[in-house]
């Protein structure tokens, strides 16, 4: 499901114009990004948390030059689903949908 699909579904269920839903959704995404950039996690009760995960410093490798590269400690954004969200997914009877990659050159 893509963002456009979500907007369409919400519009159908609520009667709110798609444009208004898109603005609200984009504003939500922007606020989540801003909060994480400022180091503040976002908690949505019953859904999950948008958090920062710390990645330790490590030595990587530039394979083109065959040189060791130091990767400093850093944070990455992550999503931690709420317990009830995880439980609902576990109990669902849906089969795992495999996404097939399409080669654009073939079409």
Describe the residue ranges of each PLM region:
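Strongly charged
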Residues: 1-107
